[in-house]
Structures are given as C-alpha cells and as structure tokens.
Amino acid sequence: VTHIENDATFKNGIDIHDKVTLTFANGATAYFECAIDDLQNKRSGKIIGTKGSIEMDYFYRPTSATVNYEGESQSVTRELDGDDFYSEIAAVHHGISYINYEAKRMSHQDTIDEVSLLERIHEVTYGK
C-alpha cells in the first residue's frame, strides 16, 4: 500500500465512521467503510472490479452472494455450520493437537502485515 486516505467522522474524539481508500503500487485502489453510527447498515460487502462485482450479505460471514460478471448475474446461497468463531476455534484446536505454531491459512507474517496496515490507517486517521 503506497497511500492511505480516511474520510473519518468523529464523535467525542473517537472515529465512529471511517471511509478508507488504499492505493497500491500498481495504481489499483481498494475502499472500505466501517461504522458504529449507522444502525441501518446491513453489514453488507461489495467487491467491485473492472469486469464485474460480488455483492454479499454479512461480509464477515456471508451466506449468500450475487456475482455480476460482464453483464450476467448469478446468486449463490450456502448455509454455514457452527457459530461465527467456529473455524477459528477449530484452527486453534488443530494447532494445539498437532503442535502447529502457525496456521496454514494465515501466517505470522500475514498477521504482522495486517496489524501494520491497521496501524498506518490509525496514523492517517489520528495523525499520530
């Protein structure tokens, strides 16, 4: 990520609505919004590309999505087993059982990179 912008709304010194744009070295951009001031938000997610988009209900645990590709649309629905943290709990259990110190799906470096990006967004937001 070469550039970060955040059009944040603050209340009592706390960011309550963030509109973050990330710019990458190749010129591609990513945008996301997160808020605690919008009770009507359905917590939906959209991924928009040059040839189409994916729209989903609850972005953090979608059970349905609509894929729009070059003018065609297809919907997919899937039931999920367990609660919101089932896969995380299963991964920890597997790691303990088999003495794995790092998950295959997300390495320690992935975690460090993610935290680093969040810290950079925080610096842009709060100027610290």
Where are these regions (language model features)?
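C-terminal helix-rich "cap/oligomerization" subdomain common to oxidoreductases
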Residues: 25, 91-128
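Tryptophan-centric aromatic hotspots in well-structured domains and transmembrane helices
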Residues: 59-60, 85-87, 121-122
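Short polybasic amphipathic segments
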Residues: 45, 62-71
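Active-site loop of classical SDR/Rossmann-like NAD(P)-dependent oxidoreductases
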Residues: 56, 77-90, 106
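Detector for glycine-centered tight turns/loop "hinges" at secondary-structure junctions
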Residues: 27, 71-72
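Contiguous beta-strand/loop segments that form the cofactor/metal-binding neighborhood of enzyme cores
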Residues: 1-61, 90-99
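Loop/helix-junction capping segments adjacent to catalytic residues or to phosphate/diphosphate-binding pockets
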Residues: 14, 41, 86, 105, ...
